[in-house]
UniProtKB/Swiss-Prot annotation:
Interacts with IFT122; the interaction associates IFTAP with IFT-A complex. This is Intraflagellar transport-associated protein. It comes from the Eukaryota. Seems to play a role in ciliary BBSome localization, maybe through interaction with IFT-A complex. The modification Phosphoserine is found at S57. InterPro entries: IFTAP (IPR040028). GO terms for cellular component: 9+0 non-motile cilium; cytosol. Keywords: Phosphoprotein. It comes from Bos taurus. GO terms for molecular function: intraciliary transport particle A binding.
Amino acid sequence: MPAKTPELEMMDEDRLIEEVLDKFVNCHEQTYEEFLRTFTHLSKDNVTKREAFGTNSSENNFTSIKFTQRNEPNDCRLSNKAIFLHTSSQCSEEEQIMIGDGQKAGSSFQGDLNRAGKVKVDNFLDIEDLDLDEEINPQLSKDVLLLPGQVEQEVSLSVPSYIPSVAIQPVTPGTKPRPTVKAADKQSKEIVGDEVQPFSLDEEFDYDAVVLTPKFTPAEMNAIKELSKQKTKSADLEDPHD
């Protein structure tokens, strides 16, 4: 058989490449409908049929298990576990049992599988379990009934946040005594209600004769005066004299 030359091999490769390119260029253009057909669309009926088929196949798999050596303890435990799984898979389809007071449900560890996997569990709270008078009513009376920005009026006597401090000056002959403010008598009375009350001045109080609390102490005032005197002296020395 004659051996192929390198030129023939190159020609064969070129032909193969041309054939592949021709198939690719001349192939049928896929439409959008054909593109959608490549996907699998599941309906509700298909899902329910698959679930039913899955449960039947799982039941058949559990029933097809055969144990040849039943006398050994390990095999007995395995059979109990298989039966427990079989009953738990059917508990969603069968009726669930409501356990009353004094009754118990079986477990796979004790070997009693009569009610295993069929017990109905109550995960909801009944209205009877809640004490409406103690829990709900105080919350409604304290939180819900209050208006926005309103405060509970539990304290009858309210202390004002600011009480003006008035210095008592000794009375000298020839000067008019200045009125003093008593904290207990002049406390503002709290007006209960949401209505806006008009503002009015106290006619008995002399607002012009109020003695204000000094900002600086006498020692600080003396120090400030000394500093001002020194500044004036230094300013006079720096200025040229005519």
